[in-house]
Swiss-Prot record:
This is UPF0280 protein Mevan_0550. It comes from Methanococcus vannielii (strain ATCC 35089 / DSM 1224 / JCM 13029 / OCM 148 / SB). HAMAP family: UPF0280. Belongs to the UPF0280 family. InterPro entries: ApbE-like_sf, MA1715-like, UPF0280. Disulfide bonds: none annotated. It comes from the Archaea.
Length: 247
């Protein structure tokens, strides 16, 4: 099945969206604008929410995006902004599902939310690691049809804050918001030699609830914990967000 693609950029939010119906682009863009406004208004009144590296206590009347970010950060013991990209992706996909989308992928800086009635292959982009571009994950339609998250944190690629040095920490979870915060938390433990760093990451992953599995790469080394999708070989070398196939 062929999907329609469009890049949507609104201030710091830059997403690659793939949908089965081009009419959904307008809905997605409105959702991003609305949620950005909600987040910006909240931060203007609660500036610590933007800068803290620790979970932030919120009130019951906080906007949905703030609640998702706060809950995900508490689950992983990181600051709420660690979940911002995955949360935007998740909210977009849920909005599209409510508007009869059958297959949609929203990628925001390596943090992906998706839903599909087809299997989807997501390629692994891990910076300079020799593993990068050679492996992909086959996500089964039964697992992703109502929404799913695949989020990656890196200490060597991108502008997001990470206190570790892993080339990639990919987390799989029902919620992209949960996966995003978890990936940041786990990636912070990637210190020491490659094998030490990977083991520390996997130990931290076992302390985090609500995630299905984790795949970590550090140079030519890799490790996993929990249940991850089937690994397959791929020859794709594009950036993480461009490596999607419907099968």
């Amino acid at each position: 099945m062929e999907l329609f693609s469009e890049k949507i950029s609104i201030k710091e939010t830059n997403v690659l969206l793939k949908v089965d119906n081009p009419k959904l682009f307008k809905i997605a863009k409105k959702k991003i604008i609305d949620e950005r406004l909600n987040l910006e208004k909240y931060i203007s009144k609660n500036p610590v929410f933007l800068t803290t590296y620790s979970p932030f206590k919120i009130s019951n009347d906080a906007p949905e995006i703030v609640k998702l970010m706060a809950n995900s950060s508490e689950n992983a013991n990181v600051g709420p902004m660690a979940a911002v990209a995955g949360t935007f992706s998740e909210l977009v996909i849920h909005s599209l599902l409510e508007n009869n989308s059958k297959s949609a992928i929203c990628e925001n800086g390596g943090d992906i939310a998706l839903s599909s009635d087809f299997d989807i292959i997501v390629g692994l982009y891990a910076g300079n690691s020799p593993i990068s571009g050679n492996l992909g994950f086959k996500l089964k339609k039964e697992k992703i049809k109502n929404g799913y998250g695949v989020c990656t944190s890196s200490g060597t690629v991108g502008h997001s804050v990470s206190f570790g040095n892993a080339d990639s920490v990919t987390v799989f979870a029902k919620s992209a918001s949960i996966a995003d915060a978890a990936a940041t938390s786990i990636g912070n433990f990637a210190v020491g030699s490659p094998d030490e760093a990977i083991n520390k990451c996997l130990e931290q992953a076992e302390n985090i609830l609500k995630i299905d599995g984790v795949f970590v790469t550090f140079q030519e080394y890799a490790g996993k914990v929990g249940k991850i999708p089937t690994l397959i070989r791929t020859e794709k070398k594009e950036a993480f967000g461009n490596v999607f196939e419907m099968v």
